[in-house]
Each structure stands twice: as C-alpha cells, then as structure tokens.
Amino acid sequence: MATLVLDNGAYNAKIGYSHAHVSVIPNCQFRSKTARLKTFTANQLDEIKDPSGLFYILPFQKGYLVNWDVQRQVWDYLFGKEMYQVDFVDTNIIITEPYFNFSSIQESMNEILFEEYQFQAVLRVNAGALSAHRYFRDNPSELCCIIVDSGYSFTHIVPYCRSKKKKEAIIRINVGGKLLTNHLKEIISYRQLHVMDETHVINQVKEDVCYVSQDFYKDMEIAKLKGEENTVMVDYVLPDFSTIKKGFCKPREEMVLSGKYKTGEQILRLTNERFAVPEILFHPSDIGIQEMGIPEAIVDSIQNLPEEMQPHFFKNIVLTGGNTLFPGFRDRVYSEVRCLTPTDYDVSVVLPENPITYSWEGGKLISENDDFEDLVVTREDYEEHGHNICEEKFDI
C-alpha cells in the first residue's frame, strides 16, 4: 500500500509518495494576460510565456480552504496522469490542514478524500505536528519543542510536548508572505513604478533582495547615504519575458550610481524596502496591525505553559515556512528571544536545511512508523461511522 504525503499549503503544495522525493508545486490556478481563455493549473505556470500581469485563482482565503472548485482541479491535476498517477484503490494519504480549522471545512475534506477520490485511509493533521515529529526523530532526547510556522497567510507559534500540541499556548500572527509581497507592491507602486498587477514578479523581487535587518536604525542610516557608501542599495533588473525571463540584481560593479542606465532595461532601485518589508514580521504595528512580532509571541506562548517546562521550549525553537528563508531571520529571532528570556535559560533556534519541505519530511517519517495504522481512519471506518470517527481521531 503506497502512502501519498500532501502538505497542502495556501501558496505551495508539497507533495510526494512517502518512498520518493518531494515536489513543491503552486497550489493554485493562473490566467495570463496573453491567453485569457486558458486556465493554467499548478506547475503549468512554467508554460506561460509572458507571466506579466498574471492573475491568481487561489483555493485558500485568509488561510482557510474555501474555494473547493479550484482545489479539486488542482488535486485532479496532481493525482492524475500528468503528475502522480495515483491508484486510489491502493493508496493512503497524509494531508495537512490549518490549526483550528472550521468543522464544515473538515467535513468537506473527509467527503472529497473518501467519497470522491476513494483513498483507502486518510490522516488529516496540522503541518506543525509533522514538523514536530521530524524534530523529535532527529533529537530523541528532547521532549518539547516550539514550532514557528511562518507561511503564506499566517505565522503560527505552536508548542509541542511529546508530539501533543498545547492548544492553550498557540498564537497566530496575521502576517505571512502574501502580506509582505502586497506591501512591497504598494511601496514600489507609490515610489517608482505601478506594479500592483505584478504579484508574480514582485514576489520574486521579495525573495531575491529582501533580508532581515539585525539593527534596523543603523540600516536606515546606511540607506540614506549617497553613492558608494550606500551598501544597502541594489538595482534590480525587471524581466521583460522576451530576452530576460527572470529578474536579477545588478552586480555592484555594474551599478550606475548617478544618472541613467544606457542598456534600456527596466530597473527598480531598492534601498530601505529590502529590510523594511520583512521587518513587519517582527513589528506588525509598523503597518497598523496591533499584534506582537514573532520573538515576543514565542516568549508569550512559552510563558503560558507550566514553569518547569519553559526551559525545554526555549532551547528547542524550530523555524519552518517560506518566510524563514529571509537572510538574517534566524539570527534576529535568536537575539530578540535571548533578550526577552531569563539569563539562566538556554536559548536555541533551529533553522532546518529546507524549512519549506520540513513538515512533508515529518509526514514521510510518520508513514513509516509501526503505529501508522492506529493514526489513520480507513475507508471502512468512515463508511461505518462517518465524520464522527474523524473528529475523534484527528486532533486539528
């Protein structure tokens, strides 16, 4: 019996058989300006010759799965002959869903997986639980860890003790990658070029040039300097999708510091945007979101737990999700948490080698466990007991 592991994120789906490798595939559909009538699904994005003005159709809104028609089409594509050629008669699935997911969404998920696709057994689980499983497998002497999952829609901070989540201490910050990209679009549109329709391009700009500042005010001073002294400034060459397929940063020695470029390329000059955008993860109040930043929320979450457990959480802080890939992210989280923590506690912040696929790898490990059969709901169970058995078994 094969097991398919699907970390069904709001932006990317991480999918693969438990005995094989993982693929990271957009969990959405696209329409392009040039081919208006055709809808592209998942990794058909690569077929679009001119992705400028790309229009996204997402199954998730504000972190929850609400558009089932789109999700079905993406799954049909992923499970179908183009991709994974799933033989449902002989396949189990491990699938992730958000924390505190609405029961109506959970019921729809059961119906679609069991009744439409007819998987043999299903395990629905939070992505953080898979990450925690992976972490405990790598660190068998540890009993506790706190998972910081900073994804597309939200950032969740979730303490796990012996693989059970501590619901009373979960914190959600309403800042994720989508908000950062949108904020960068607004800043660039206000200061330089109108890019409000260019989500795809600006998302790439964000990933290529943004970083987390270790000293915000010092970097702000550097960003004000003129010419050579301004080490923060970069010139980003935007793609035109004929000769330049993907944007890139001009090498420092080729930058024209005063005057215009002769090459005819379209250039974005970025200075304080590079670190002011990721700063929102640490100070959401900068843009009027009255919430704690990530380091404060980690400390607040741990302080909601019994005192004798707290030191174990401080020394097992695990970062997952796409936003943790900003250069400097781990160091900043460490230094701020260290400042807020009693001196006699050790603080350790772990950034896995691939924080995007970390929870998928946890799912792969769970599928190889001896007790895997006790965790899943089989089709026979579901046909006999319906949604109730899923509610009992799955701790969402």
From Swiss-Prot:
Subcellular locations according to the entry: Cytoplasm, Cytoskeleton; Nucleus; Nucleus, Nucleolus
Gene3D superfamilies named in the record: 3.30.420.40, Actin, Chain A, domain 2, Actin, Chain A, domain 4
Main location: cytoplasm
Keywords associated with the record: Activator, Cytoplasm, Cytoskeleton, Nucleus, Repressor, Transcription, Transcription regulation
Keyword check for Nucleus: yes
Source taxon at top rank: Eukaryota
SMART domains hit by this protein: ACTIN (SM00268)
Family matches, as InterPro entries: Actin, ATPase_NBD
An annotated Gene Ontology molecular function: nucleosome binding
A Pfam family hit: Actin
Entry GO terms, CC: cytoplasm; cytoskeleton; nucleolus; nucleus; Swr1 complex
GO biological process terms held by the UniProt record: negative regulation of transcription by RNA polymerase I; nucleolus organization; positive regulation of transcription by RNA polymerase I
Function: Required for formation and/or maintenance of the proper nucleolar structure and function. Plays a dual role in the regulation of ribosomal DNA (rDNA) transcription. In the presence of high glucose, it maintains active rDNA transcription through H2A.Z deposition and under glucose starvation, is required for the repression of rDNA transcription, and this function may be independent of H2A.Z.
Family: Belongs to the actin family. ARP6 subfamily.
Subunit comment: Interacts with CBX1 and CBX3.
The name this protein goes by in its record: Actin-related protein 6
Native species: Gallus gallus (Chicken)
